[in-house]
A protein has these predicted regions:
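Short, hydrophobic/amphipathic alpha-helical patches that form generic packing surfaces
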Residues: 30-31, 84, 181
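Basic, alpha-helical nucleic-acid-contacting "clamp/cap" segments
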Residues: 58-159
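Short, basic (Lys/Arg/His-rich) helix/loop patches that form interaction surfaces
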Residues: 18, 154-182
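Flexible interdomain linker/hinge and immediately adjacent N-terminus
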Residues: 1-14, 139-143
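Internal, hydrophobic cores of structured domains that mediate oligomerization or house catalytic pockets
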Residues: 29-71
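Residue-level marker of regulatory loop/turn positions in helix-turn-helix DNA-binding domains and
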Residues: 17-21, 31, 74, 127, ...
Length: 182
């Protein structure tokens, strides 16, 4: 094992596995360190570019196809980290209510070395999910915009409102009455 591989494994063990932020961070680390992708390459990926099946992750990048094999330890398994992030993205499209996603992710058991591998079977996602960016923008309240998720990958250099004639709806956090109603 090289020093780079050892450091990558140590970082994956140290990264939080709980919550959708932890899942996103682990997925980014896998793509940058295990797959050796640059920030620019990662930014262009869509969910459809990542296929998880039979203990491997196949990433179709502009530079070619990258295959990551599963690890015995779930904490350092790159395909499992990607599968967990893809599951969150699929929930964003299926359940537009943020509270549903938060409840499902919060109830998930924390990762351990004996956690089940999610990469062993096929990781299915909807057609709408496959079109969205693998790392969609997050608004100032920490939410992934449903508009972005449903519209798919766009050129991030041009603001959404400019691409759509200034008709973009702004996301707002729920007010106190909405929070107390749940």
């Amino acid at each position: 094992m090289t020093l780079q591989q050892q450091r990558t494994q140590e970082a994956l063990r140290a990264l939080p596995s709980a919550g959708w932020v932890g899942r996103r961070d682990r997925a980014v680390h896998v793509l940058s360190q295990m797959a050796g992708m640059s920030d620019e390459q990662i930014a262009t990926l869509t969910v459809g570019d990542v296929v998880i099946a039979d203990g491997a992750a196949t990433i179709t990048a502009p530079t070619g196809t990258i295959t990551l094999a599963a690890s015995i330890d779930t904490l350092i398994c790159g395909p499992c980290a990607l599968a967990r992030w893809l599951h969150v993205l699929d929930m964003i499209v299926i359940y537009p209510d943020r509270y549903v996603i938060d409840a499902v992710v919060a109830r998930a058991a924390p990762l351990s070395t004996n956690s089940p591998h999610l990469c062993r079977g096929a990781c299915a996602s909807t057609d709408a999910t496959r079109q969205m960016p693998l790392l969609p923008p997050i608004d100032r309240w920490g939410l992934i915009s449903a508009i972005t998720a449903q519209r798919g990958h766009r050129d991030s250099r041009q603001p959404y409102a400019l691409r759509h004639g200034g008709t973009a709806r702004a996301h707002r956090p729920p007010d106190t009455r909405e929070l107390l109603a749940h």
